[in-house]
Swiss-Prot record:
The keyword Cell membrane does not apply. This is Zinc finger protein 479. SMART domains: KRAB (SM00349), ZnF_C2H2 (SM00355). The keyword Transcription applies. Expressed primarily in testis and fetal tissues. CDD domains: KRAB_A-box. Residues 16-87 form the KRAB domain. GO terms for cellular component: nucleus. A zinc finger (C2H2-type) spans 185-212, 213-235, 241-263, 269-291, 297-319, 325-347, 353-375, 381-403, 409-431, 437-459, 465-487, 493-515. The gene is ZNF479. Keywords: DNA-binding, Metal-binding, Nucleus, Repeat, Transcription, Transcription regulation, Zinc, Zinc-finger. It comes from Homo sapiens (Human). It comes from the Eukaryota.
Length: 524
């Protein structure tokens, strides 16, 4: 292809194509990049292409740009797609395409390597994020650029990852460059330094609070186009990343990467304090707060602080009353997903927690934990008033009401108060007449489950309650309690009229008839 001469006094100018300023990664190199680095690559390549177009250079759209604009995952782009399959339309640098400052400013972003001054006086390639130090390039025409590249190859900087960059103005010259991590782009406000100009530009958006990328669906705005693109998946429901092991699909590649650790058992994040390992870095961050005691998430309503943001979110529902987790079977709603999970076991009758001692199974792990105390005899909850021990914290709470006299549960029908909610529930059946507990032997129904249990012993003949004094056995604990008063002489039931005392409540009821004159028994 012919070359067009430049301005008087200059040498012939090379041909600029998109391939000349493209960046190519091998598959191995690409896999070393994380999600943020891949997004940055996409943004830089799109910006480079737009810069060429904005300069008036007639460049046909390469396949790579088409893929990137369609948000195609870059690791799925074959290497032959990284460079246009067909040569892009070439263009000469003519006099009317060389506005001095425009070319300099644009190439500062487009050309990812540094040269001092090369060739024409008006075309100076400035330092950009891919360079370190000042590089002297031989003066002369663009035909000497290849020599310039060879001269500077030995000065190219070091890094952990290779990045292939196409030679400038030469499709045949490709050399590996390395990056030292030197940071030459500095934020004027806080002094933070960056190794890439695009990183500095993204950082400065934090100060301006500019959010130029807006979601058309929900109106949410973002600082970075990559964040905007990632957000869109929420609305589309797209899940392009599928696990080869179990087939589960994910919206983001990072989620798939984390999920795979479920199958591999990999836990790459280790706590330096205690050595505990985690699959996610966020889990390690949350765990570290156990050691530091940090609780950065505070409830604005009550001031309670939490170490994990999700715990604060769950806590807020106490104040709002929100119950977003609904059972599909019965429609019952819950504030927390864990409560819904436990509730579902009522419908499925699943009991995944089995006692190793006796084999009894439970739907809740907490129930199994309490059950184990039957075997161990552990009673970790002690009353500070009387020293009595209990297996359950709820039992201690109920017991304390004996000392305080608290009766927080009131019947709306008759105003009677109770210390237990279950006792109030049982009491309400007196007003409703409900008898939900039915004997399968004789069909007799009862309002209390305990009464049905006692009744069944009539059919079985079981008498599990034995008096330690005389050895007499009873089928009800209440009957044993009444019997013991024969030995103790206790008379807890006292008449308010004459103060006569009785061992049994039924005896007091009969005695009261003397004072009232009531004659309830009539001859038919």
């Amino acid at each position: 292809m012919a070359k067009r001469p430049g301005p008087p006094g200059s040498r012939e100018m090379g041909l600029l194509t998109f391939r000349d300023i493209a960046i190519e990664f091998s598959l191995e190199e690409w896999q070393c990049l994380d999600c943020a680095q891949r997004n940055l690559y996409r943004d830089v390549m799109l910006e480079n292409y737009r810069n060429l177009v904005s300069l008036g250079i007639a460049v046909s759209k390469p396949d790579l740009i088409t893929c990137l604009e369609q948000n195609k995952e870059s690791q799925n782009i074959k290497r032959n797609e990284m460079v246009a399959k067909h040569p892009v339309t070439r263009s000469h640098f003519t006099q009317d395409l060389q506005p001095e400052q425009g070319i300099k400013d644009s190439l500062q972003k487009v050309i990812p390597r540094t040269y001092g001054k090369c060739g024409h006086e008006k075309l100076q390639f400035k330092k950009c994020c891919k360079s370190v130090g000042e590089y002297e390039v031989h003066k002369g025409g663009y035909s000497e650029v290849n020599q310039c590249l060879s001269t500077t190859q030995n000065k190219i900087f070091q890094t952990h990852k290779y990045v292939k960059v196409f030679g400038k103005f030469s499709n045949s010259n490709r050399d590996k460059t390395r990056y030292t991590g030197n940071k030459h782009f500095k934020c004027n406000k806080y002094g933070k330094s960056f190794c890439m100009l695009s990183h500095l530009n993204q950082h400065q958006v934090i100060h301006t609070r500019e959010k130029s990328y807006k979601c058309k669906e929900c109106g949410k705005s973002f600082n970075c186009s990559s964040n905007h693109t990632t957000h869109k998946i929420i609305h589309t429901g797209e899940k392009p990343y599928r696990c080869e092991e179990c087939g589960k699909a994910f919206s983001w590649s990072a989620n798939l990467t984390r999920h795979k650790r479920t199958h591999t058992g990999e836990k790459p994040y280790t706590c330096e304090e205690c050595g505990q390992a985690f699959r996610r870095s966020s889990a390690l961050t949350n765990h570290k707060r156990i050691h530091t005691g940090e609780r950065p998430y505070k409830c604005e309503e009550c001031g309670k602080a939490f170490s994990v943001s999700s715990t604060l979110t769950d806590h807020k529902r106490i104040h709002t009353g929100e119950k977003p987790c609904r059972c599909e079977e019965c429609g019952k709603a819950f504030s927390w997903s864990s409560n819904l999970t436990r509730h579902k076991r009522i419908h499925t009758r699943e009991k995944p927690y089995a006692c190793e001692e006796c084999g009894q199974a439970f739907s809740l792990s907490s129930n199994l934990m309490r059950h184990r105390r039957i075997h161990t005899g552990e009673k970790p909850y002690t009353c500070e008033e009387c020293g009595q021990d209990f297996r359950r914290s709820s039992a201690l709470t109920i017991h304390k009401r004996i000392h305080t006299g608290e009766r927080p549960y009131k019947c709306e029908e008759c105003g009677k108060v109770f210390s237990l909610s279950s006792t109030l529930t049982d009491h309400k059946r007196i007003h409703t007449g409900e008898r939900p507990y039915k004997c399968e032997e004789c069909g007799k129904a009862f309002s209390l489950s305990s009464t049905l249990t006692d009744h069944k012993r009539i059919h079985t003949g079981e008498r599990p309650y034995t008096c330690e004094e005389c050895g007499k056995a009873f089928n009800c604990s209440s009957t044993l309690m009444q019997h013991k008063r024969i030995h103790t002489g206790e008379k807890p039931y006292k008449c308010e009229e004459c103060e006569q005392a009785f061992k049994w409540h039924s005896s007091l009821a009969k005695h009261k008839i003397i004072h009232t004159g009531e004659k309830p028994y009539k001859c038919e």
